[in-house]
Structure formats: structure tokens, C-alpha cells
Amino acid sequence: VNADSAIEYWENVDDVKQILLYMESIADPKRFRTLASRTTKKKPILALKAGRSAAGASAASSHTGSLAGADKAADALLKQSGVIREFSLQDLFNTAKVFSHCPIPKGNRVAIVTNSGGPGIMATDAVCEHGMEMAPLSDQPKEALRSFLPAAASVKNPVDMIASAPLEHYKKTLETVLADDGVDMVVVIYLPFLGLKDIDVAKAVMEIRAAHPDKPIVGVFMTKNEFFAHLSETQVNVPFFMFAEQAVEGLARLNQQRLWRKRTDTPAPRYSVDTEAVEAVFKQAAADNREQLTTGESLQVLTAYGIRVCRDGEAKDADEAVALADKIGYPVVMKLNSKKI
């Protein structure tokens, strides 16, 4: 069973909300693109494509019995098909966790609620690095936040409630931020503070998430591993992470899926090709028993396909080379054009 077959099988299965793939090769790129492009409009496809290095590609080829192919070509194909590519199993499952608990956002504006300035700044950097926007909170929610947060708190985005923020401040701040129409997604950050239990904050966040199902919320809880072990035994509706970068990466994937769904399906442009010229070049190479084209022949093929190439000419001695360079215009480069070298 290859990736094409898996996508085709799961495309119209309503119980399957997302498709995760581990791939070493793409046997039929055209079929893969057709199936994946259609399916990713309905549900996300996350792919871990192995064989990025030359050694890895060689191992994949011997393991699967098929040619792994150039990784850049595979990467381009995945992007053109709307497939979200991940580069580790951890990233694959982190992204899957976000898609499992979050809706697709309506925009790319992110708000951050935190009880510590440092992680809030790191989350802000990650938001900007992923091409998303920090949501500019409007005056009304700012005034509402000022009414109950201490004077030392910051009501700008990121909203820093300061370290001593009680559970009630988490609840009211998150509710206020979610009510702002200019906010599409929210990151909630918690650092341990005396008297405030991580699990209590998490439960409050999940209760609010249930009341606001249309906006993605991700949690960053920089606390003990026991917290995450406890979550595994609980019914959750919010993805929780240890670090801000992981959470923001998940939001970026949601935004990537949003942008893909917005794309209109337009037919690929078709270009006229001088097939006779191309055929003549390859026939001559075959007649000469050559496996490679010369520089001149390569330029002929590119020109026949309508691809713009640099101005060129052929010189057989130094005088011809100087005259040709003067005609083309400087700077110029010189390459050997030989069927033997």
C-alpha cells in the first residue's frame, strides 16, 4: 500500500479527520498530486518524507525497491498538493494534536495571554517568524483588562498578567481576548506560581475553549512532566505544549491549511512547445550514443519549451570569442561546448 492508495481510501471517510503519512518515495507524482490536491481541500494531510540526505535517499531506495528521487522535487510536489510536510515524528504528532483539537482559524492574527514576560516574548518572535500577525487589541478589551488586572500588568498583546495572576485573572483575561473580533487564535502561557496549580489553569482554559469553539486555543505550560502525564488520562479539547515555539508552530500549520483552502482551483498554464526541435536534439544525442546533452543542446531544449535563457553564441577561436562577447555585452562567461567532454 502506497501513499496514493491511502489517500484515495481515506479521502471520503468522514470519521477520518486528518491523514498522517510516512513516505520514502512518491511512485506516481501525477496521481499523488491529483489525489492529494483534492483531499487537502477537505482535510489536512501531514507527511513525514524521509530520505532528505543523499545517504538517506540511497537507503530508502534499497529498502523500498523504488527510487526515492530528489528531495527538492518531492518538497515542491508536497507544497503544490497542499500537503503539510514535517521533518520529525515529534513534529508530525504535535501538528496532528493541534488539528485534533482546533478549528481552522478565520485569519492569522494571534493573541498571547501569559503570566511571564519572557515566554510571551519568545511566543511573539515565533508568531512573527511564521509570517502571522500579533493581533492589535482594540480599546474596549484593553479597558476591560485594566479594570481587573494589576497596574504592573501589560494589556497590550502579549497580555502579561504578571507572575502572581490568580486563576480568576486567567479566566477573565482569556474570555476578554477571545471576545475581540480582531483575534483569530490565542496562545495561553502558564509558568508555575505558588498557590496556583497547573491542572486547575488547564481545566479553566478547556472550559472556556468549549464555550468558544470557533477560535483555536493552544496552551504552553512550562511545568513538570507529571502535568502532561495527568492530561493523558483526561478528556482534553486544547493542545498543551511545554514550549512556546511548539505551540506557535501548530498555529502556523492551522494557518497554512487555511491559506490552502482559500486558494482557487485554476487550470495550470499550458505552453506551446517546439516538439520537433526537442526531438531532433535527443535523436542526435542517441545517435551519438551520448547520455548527456551539450550546453548548446540544453539551451536549444529550454528555448523550445519557451524558457528564457541567456544570450549565447559559439566561437571557435579567440578572435571570434572577443567579437561575440562584444556583441552580447559584458559581463560574459565562457563554457566548453563538446560532445566528448
Stretch-by-stretch model annotation:
Residues 1-341:
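Catalytic-core regions of core metabolic enzymes
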